[in-house]
Amino acid sequence: MVPVENAEGPSLLKPKGRAAETDGSDRASGGPHPPWARGCGMYTLLSSVTAAVSGFLVGYELGIISGALLQIRTLLVLTCHEQEMVVSSLLIGALLASLIGGVLIDRYGRRAAIILSSCLLGLGSLVLIISLSYTTLIGGRIAIGVFISLSSTATCVYIAEIAPQHRRGLLVSLNELMIVIGILFAYISNYAFANISHGWKYMFGLVIPLGVLQAIAMYFLPPSPRFLVMKGHEEAASKVLGKLRAVLDTTEELTVIKSSLKDEYQYSFWDLFRSKDNMRTRIMIGLTLVFFVQITGQPNILFYASTVLKSVGFQSNEAASLASTGVGVVKVISTIPATLLVDQVGSKTFLCIGSSVMAASLVTMGIVNLNIHMNFTSICRNHSPINQSLDESVFYGPGNLSASNDTLRESFKGMTFHSRSSLRPTRNDINGRGETTLASLPNAGLSQTEYQIVTDSADVPTFLKWLSLASLLVYVAAFSIGLGPMPWLVLSEIFPGGIRGRAMALTSSMNWGINLLISLTFLTVTDLIGLPWVCFIYTVMSLASLVFVIVFIPETKGCSLEQISVELAKENYVKNNICFMSHHREELVPKQLQKRKPQEQFLESKKLRGKGQPRQLSSEV
């Protein structure tokens, strides 16, 4: 639970041995926060939690397809490519929405965007519930994708702009915590409805009431004070700040906001790619960071968790859904400490730890799966009802074949088929027992699908199966403390307020575009090169992300958004290696500025810029 403090009380989450303040002299001496920086009252907490409900809904929608797909692919007789399209259609909607989301957020406000996205969630969910065809299913998933993209961007920006600077990391990361809780509930729902007829409709419909309630609640919450200042409503912004900070005098914080926004009205979208205020470097950092979020493989674990777990030995839909629930539990448990400690430890440290552990776990997972000797997975087989009946007698899994016909089983034991064949089940009614056998018939009328005939399940050590699951869980845990929550905190901080919405929308487009590409090809690539080599590719990407974080990502804990913007505007930001700026206060801040208040530091820095002197940033804790 987030500690709540009144206007008079000190911070309850100070880093040990260091002052938690963000203004000049008070921070250096370990004194209390100024009133405008202290305010993390109940109203701020309530607004942040209500907005973060979007995170829960996003997580639920991202995770629910993992189990729903197991039922839908059989009901609608989906091919491998169609399964990929069902999963990826959500990402198509998200990508399309991200292209216009920034304009909506900057023009109509962060709160209005959240309300609109909740309405889209309800509409898309209704379409999914009544969908009776592949086409309507795709349409509903696209609508859900629009909700996810718009909601994700608006929520991060909204919380970052209403939070006091010393609680910003905690409150923004709350959104990621809600996302993983939503994923966990999605996996629980997958398990609960795994054996219920048309259970996928219940899975898709459970979130509608919560989405409606959030839209209503957000209507009564305040707009972002920074957005109000951007629109010229300074009096309204002052009132909102007073409620959020639980203080009467908001002059100082309002002055800082106005000063930081004064020169930002002239930003255009194309300024993101120009050298002005070093925006080109900032957008490069943002785009590369979200690239690594996706290219390290986490989306595939999220969307195809149940499918992948079936391929490594968790055989039934129910068993695979239950195992994927463990993935959700690990995500929640791992995200909680990252959320609570981000303001003390810093986002950069968590990113480094997460990328390192991800690489180690992926190597282990790849080596283990090499030893399982999976000659082929049955992920892409045809899931028609006739093949579903076959599943009762023939088990498809890594290193497994079992059939009621013992002679058939012995005949194929140890054999591997590398080419495609059309397999159909035939029902032997001659002996009256209705035993199922296999017939490999060319041009049998069924779609071309791939099967594996390999060794008995007894040949696959149980230890390897569980070690593979353990490696997967460690990988998920590492992602949940690093590349899961931290990039969105960094993105909400590194762009100036006047262009933040458009910058977030562009990085969101990159995020969804890469996600779409990876998810749309995962099953195909896995069939082509095998799961072990997919793991090794993700390992290389995790190590590359570690190097990128060390070199380029700033440590912004304890700094105000205005201070961060001033520092990143330096043309020699990367050359000066300011990545660990929290540990180099005296090098970064002229002594004459250290005793001044934040707004004075900001204005003085602007004067220094006009004289051709380097722009400096007040350090955080």
Curated annotation (Swiss-Prot):
Superkingdom of source: Eukaryota
Tissues where the protein occurs: Detected at high level in spleen and skeletal muscle, intermediate levels in kidney, testis and mammary gland, and at lower levels in liver, lung and intestine.
Topological type in the membrane: Multi-pass membrane protein
Glycosylation sites recorded in the entry for this protein: N195, N375, N387, N400, N405
Region (Disordered): 1-33
PTMs per UniProt: N-glycosylated.
Family indicated by similarity: Belongs to the major facilitator superfamily. Sugar transporter (TC 2.A.1.1) family. Glucose transporter subfamily.
Record's protein name: Solute carrier family 2, facilitated glucose transporter member 12
Organism expressing this protein natively: Bos taurus (Bovine)
Lineage, broadest ranks: Eukaryota, Metazoa, Chordata, Craniata, Vertebrata
Encoding gene (name): SLC2A12
